[in-house]
Amino acid sequence: MVKLTHLLARAWLVPLAYGASQSLLSTTAPSQPQFTIPASADVGAQLIANIDDPQAADAQSVCPGYKASKVQHNSRGFTASLQLAGRPCNVYGTDVESLTLSVEYQDSDRLNIQILPTHVDSTNASWYFLSENLVPRPKASLNASVSQSDLFVSWSNEPSFNFKVIRKATGDALFSTEGTVLVYENQFIEFVTALPEEYNLYGLGEHITQFRLQRNANLTIYPSDDGTPIDQNLYGQHPFYLDTRYYKGDRQNGSYIPVKSSEADASQDYISLSHGVFLRNSHGLEILLRSQKLIWRTLGGGIDLTFYSGPAPADVTRQYLTSTVGLPAMQQYNTLGFHQCRWGYNNWSDLADVVANFEKFEIPLEYIWTDIDYMHGYRNFDNDQHRFSYSEGDEFLSKLHESGRYYVPIVDAALYIPNPENASDAYATYDRGAADDVFLKNPDGSLYIGAVWPGYTVFPDWHHPKAVDFWANELVIWSKKVAFDGVWYDMSEVSSFCVGSCGTGNLTLNPAHPSFLLPGEPGDIIYDYPEAFNITNATEAASASAGASSQAAATATTTSTSVSYLRTTPTPGVRNVEHPPYVINHDQEGHDLSVHAVSPNATHVDGVEEYDVHGLYGHQGLNATYQGLLEVWSHKRRPFIIGRSTFAGSGKWAGHWGGDNYSKWWSMYYSISQALSFSLFGIPMFGADTCGFNGNSDEELCNRWMQLSAFFPFYRNHNELSTIPQEPYRWASVIEATKSAMRIRYAILPYFYTLFDLAHTTGSTVMRALSWEFPNDPTLAAVETQFMVGPAIMVVPVLEPLVNTVKGVFPGVGHGEVWYDWYTQAAVDAKPGVNTTISAPLGHIPVYVRGGNILPMQEPALTTREARQTPWALLAALGSNGTASGQLYLDDGESIYPNATLHVDFTASRSSLRSSAQGRWKERNPLANVTVLGVNKEPSAVTLNGQAVFPGSVTYNSTSQVLFVGGLQNLTKGGAWAENWVLEW
């Protein structure tokens, strides 16, 4: 391995404390921070989470539930009145005495159940009702009826109201509240559903956790700016899950015997049935997975459940996206290239150097990004004119665009509010927003003023009718100064570095330094490295350890071991939104909802408190940014947005990155399950900060991670301020590993793009779990260390240090599936259900092609623009039955409504391959070659539409059974898909 000390000797490597001195406080003189917000400003109340509180009441034990009456049936379902079945328990709020139940069979595969208060008015409607202007509800189809539904609802009043959602085909209860009580209060709702003994649930995000949810998990859902802690609430809110159940039986005769995945035998035949459940709610949530039950708890809102009957996992995802939250946005072709970013690029020259180094080492680069370093005083839409001047930027970006590359800057959710006593501190963006009065308010009507990077800040009120136009206009104004190609929308949970409106009365202290040390400042030098760094870099590790110990000793503080917890006693008819009586296990200090966030009492223009819509802030900001980019590009170019906080449906506007992860092997490991979850949520454009964000990376970790992320839809390297540089050209072995994986990625970009078109038009997934692609194999239910890219490619990455092999399973082997090694093109010899040991030395990532698929490919290049100008190739991997199929979608790669498109279908048999194209997009590049895997005998001749292919261009390997047909350019000069053709051998 190349040691760190050797790397530091290389002239083009930036020193360890990369950019710290310039980037931390580098702003124009009038905006130099002189005041540091005290750390106490972000200290909230000390609360104890209900699940950890020995004094907490169990609502199931003390609440009476409800009784149903006045049932009225209609063609699409029924309604009923629910009345409290006893004395109010008021355990975590005020009981709602009268509820209305609505059951609607919305389509053959979709059912909706609503339970909402019967009596509300304008003063409390937002406590329970989520406006359809914010989150649309799924609509019933014209032909929907009870008789046509896959599902059926039954209910009972014994001992209190409960209901079941039953799959007609099996009689299984997919959702059952039998034996439990419904608790419905103004700040607390609880309902419980039964689950099978050994259940397989996926989703319920956002969390860093196992792909198949643990059966004793406590899942808090409340968007939070808190890095990427394991098993805690993160940035987004996705109260949707997939439930897969396995059976031994026969669909034809209706025989279904439940099977536990842990007891399944890979040599046996099974079937599976999956369904999905979505809770349309934007309040804080807690979902407790227990033995044979799931407990839903919310801090408000209503019960608005939609059930999707599947029965395959792919069906569930399609039903959820097409009917309820919206189909994913179609991405620009170029966004599938490689993206490079870091917090600490100090000026345009730094960016130019990075681009030059990618070219020097011939590593593909599509997008260069900047973090908050470019900003004037960390203000949105305003460049630092000393380091990121508009004139220098225009020159740099012109050259960047000429080279076929692009630029994305970060934009934060908060906006600086200038110092009223400093005329030089003027900020036009704030002035325009204030003129339109589009910022969040305190309950008394004054501005809510929090604190983020620039100091004291205000926050757009997305409920204000002028807010989206204001935001869009700021993007348009800025775009005339900086020719950016997308937006990275951050800090949108929405984050604030203090509790409450801490800037009220303190604006004369602006600009202000955050209440915590920034990376690289004295006391926060980054000494952390990956887990195995001490083994492979002993000298450097010892030095880092000594530095860390010294820093820890210098900054050590004493803490009290005695903690007094604040507990809120419910007041009848009154809500306490800052400290609700029920305390969710929120992963901020003290579990206080106001810590490191805009307070729940911040008020929107329509009177709605942030408490009721907290989960939507980032979602609405993504919509505003999407609308803004439409204006920037005159509704011609697809907006490219990567956002941090997301909600159900955010995928129709943006992609998502995994947040502030760590340069650790465990962080790389969990990136797969996080990506698969976001596939489920309908946000396929997902990627993790490759090589890790927090802490220093090292050669081995970055080597493996650059290869893993090459198969994620969004592929970006990013790290934090003051850590060592980790661009892929920093280590010799990483250069080669990156180029090796990128050669595959860039070759299959047409396949990736086709997958995105299918996701955008049908609701299919791009990155897939093995259990979704092979739904009838229970042994795959928990697999999270390998994954599929579409239906054709399987990736088996190395996820631990100091190894040269990896274990991988080959699904379907023994049941007709054939797998081919990408590199050797030979069929894999594997046994059913066996974790096969695969050679994987550093720099090699095992990749396999599934038999039965045809991949359209082009030659790799340094940019996607260059790659799109290269000849075509096809890789046809024959299945065990000697057939294969595939498809290709093409357009101009960026238009929202392309003037011309092309769809190509490919089919292959044991002796031929056919191409059939439809559409008006003119693809001029010829077909160069076709490779067919699994050809069991050497052909005597090869023809294309009856014309003989020159024998010298045809090779056959009898050992690997690979047929290669080259020399096709002259036969396809008009374009590979200009006419339909058949290749015969």
Curated annotation (Swiss-Prot):
It is an enzyme of class 3 (hydrolase). It catalyses: Hydrolysis of terminal, non-reducing (1->4)-linked alpha-D-glucose residues with release of alpha-D-glucose. Changing residue 929 to M: In strain: GN-8. GO terms for molecular function: alpha-1,4-glucosidase activity; carbohydrate binding. Keywords: Glycoprotein, Glycosidase, Hydrolase, Signal. Gene3D superfamilies: Glycosidases, glycosyl hydrolase (family 31), Golgi alpha-mannosidase II. It comes from the Eukaryota. Residues 1-25 form the signal peptide. The active site is at residues 490, 493, 660. The O-linked saccharide is not identified, but is probably mannose. Coiled coil: none annotated. InterPro entries: Gal_mutarotase_sf_dom (IPR011013), Glyco_hydro_31_AS (IPR030458), Glyco_hydro_31_C (IPR048395), Glyco_hydro_31_CS (IPR030459), Glyco_hydro_31_N_dom (IPR025887), Glyco_hydro_31_TIM (IPR000322), Glyco_hydro_b (IPR013780), Glycoside_hydrolase_SF (IPR017853). One of its GO terms (biological process) is carbohydrate metabolic process. Glycans are attached at residues 36, 124, 143, 218, 347, 422, 506, 534, 537, 545, 550, 559-562, 571, 601, 623, 835, 881, 895, 899, 957, 970. Its EC number is 3.2.1.20. Belongs to the glycosyl hydrolase 31 family. PANTHER family: ALPHA-GLUCOSIDASE, P-TYPE DOMAIN-CONTAINING PROTEIN. This is Alpha-glucosidase. The gene is aglA.
